[in-house]
Amino acid sequence: MMPTQRLAEADPQIAKLIREETRRQAEGLELIASENFVSPAVLEALGSTLTNKYAEGYPGKRYYGGCEVVDQVEQLAIDRAKQLFGADHANVQPHAGSQANMAAYFALAKPGDTVLAMSLNFGGHLTHGSPVNFSGKLFKIVPYGLRQSDETIDMDEVARLAREHKPRILMVGASAYSRTLHFDRFAEIANEVGAAMVVDMAHIAGLVAAGLHPSPVPHSEIVTTTTHKTLRGPRGGMILCREAHAKTLNSQIFPGIQGGPLEHVIAAKAVAFGEALRPEFKAYQRRIVENAQVLAEGLKSAGLRLVSGGTDNHLMLVDLRPKKLTGKIAEEALGKAGITVNKNMIPWDPEKPMTTSGIRVGTPALTTRGMGSREMTLVAALIGRVLDAPADEQVLARVRGEVKDLCAHFPMYADRV
């Protein structure tokens, strides 16, 4: 017989921890660039009975019966994704961005083939060739980086390495890069050497959807993304591609690397894509960028150095070496003050990955709460105060109180705290 108790009765320990996490999110400043807050509608879809349904295969071609409804759900997600990004084909089944990238590699290359990708040390992602990741274990990785003069991608180096190594795949994208990615120039290089171009737009997908960052779709064989971050959907992945690659790509996801899709998550993706198709989503993305630029100027006014001097998108990297701090110390001190960031490697970082010389800061979550330029100026000042006295418990306590007061003016998930 099915248990009928609600969570608070059935498992009070988990219920309590969920309330605590909701309170932490509601009462603190979330500045991790890869995090955001989903809408109540997305949460509702995630908690739906769709979680009960197994649906191996694709709409209209399932290996299980009873898929009439989930076929419609998944097709809605596919159609909305294609409309949102102007793509020929969309696969909404990847459980995460890593699976999306794995499928893209397997669709276009064989183990041992050469992949030219941005180094993790300069802002790339683990799945772009880190030796501890499947991508670095299965493929020959040639990394590209930044120019020291302005800390932007060295396109001359990309072209030189492409001509020298003739990669099968040119992987474009980053997890800690604050400047515009010029996909047209990357595509010229890929075409010159006969490489297939794959773009991982996980961080900037929302900006791309809103027309605030150049779209990779017209230039790329395959585009991968997560569905959270700036896109403000559930945690998950997605792949866009040209029709010529659709069949191969689909087979790489299922049965290649995944079994049954998570239809409750796919429903939540569909809801988020529907939200992103509305005019107010473009206004939201504009505010993300505006807030990032105001926050960047505020951090510089607080005496902090930003990698490349600023930002074109939703995030920025703060170089803490002038403050004689590590990213680990800064993350911990800011956390005590109710400000959540993540320690992050900076270009040519002398520290280890679990220590780092920098922090990464982003504005999507605070923008979702409704905060604007005035609040960004205040947040920058609060960060500056903490980093000027990271070991002063009185300063941290005062800032934490101010953070809580600020958050109270922008309530979130009030019915869940």
Curated annotation (Swiss-Prot):
Site entry: Plays an important role in substrate specificity: 228
- What cofactor is this protein dependent on? pyridoxal 5'-phosphate
A Gene Ontology biological process noted in the UniProt record is: glycine biosynthetic process from serine
Keyword presence, 4Fe-4S = no
Q: Which is one GO molecular function term here?
A: pyridoxal phosphate binding
EC number of this enzyme: 2.1.2.1
Q: Which UniProt keywords apply?
A: Amino-acid biosynthesis, Cytoplasm, One-carbon metabolism, Pyridoxal phosphate, Transferase
Q: Where does it live in the cell? A: Cytoplasm
Reactions mediated catalytically? (6R)-5,10-methylene-5,6,7,8-tetrahydrofolate + glycine + H2O = (6S)-5,6,7,8-tetrahydrofolate + L-serine
**SUPFAM superfamilies attached to this UniProt entry:** PLP-dependent transferases (SSF53383)
Q: Give residue numbers for the modification (N6-(pyridoxal phosphate)lysine).
A: 229
GO cellular component terms, alphabetically, are:
cytosol
Return the Pfam families for the record: SHMT (PF00464)
InterPro entries from the UniProt entry:
PyrdxlP-dep_Trfase, PyrdxlP-dep_Trfase_major, PyrdxlP-dep_Trfase_small, Ser_HO-MeTrfase, Ser_HO-MeTrfase-like, Ser_HO-MeTrfase_PLP_BS, SHMT-like_dom
Which pathway does the protein contribute to? Answer: One-carbon metabolism; tetrahydrofolate interconversion; Amino-acid biosynthesis; glycine biosynthesis; glycine from L-serine: step 1/1
Q: Where does (6S)-5,6,7,8-tetrahydrofolate bind?
A: 120, 124-126
**Residue stretches in coiled coil:** none
Q: What does this protein do?
A: Catalyzes the reversible interconversion of serine and glycine with tetrahydrofolate (THF) serving as the one-carbon carrier. This reaction serves as the major source of one-carbon groups required for the biosynthesis of purines, thymidylate, methionine, and other important biomolecules. Also exhibits THF-independent aldolase activity toward beta-hydroxyamino acids, producing glycine and aldehydes, via a retro-aldol mechanism.
Q: Which family does it belong to?
A: Belongs to the SHMT family.
How it assembles, according to the record, is: Homodimer.
**Protein name listed in UniProt:** Serine hydroxymethyltransferase
Q: Which organism is it from?
A: Anaeromyxobacter dehalogenans (strain 2CP-1 / ATCC BAA-258)
Q: What is the lineage of its organism?
A: Bacteria, Pseudomonadati, Myxococcota, Myxococcia, Myxococcales
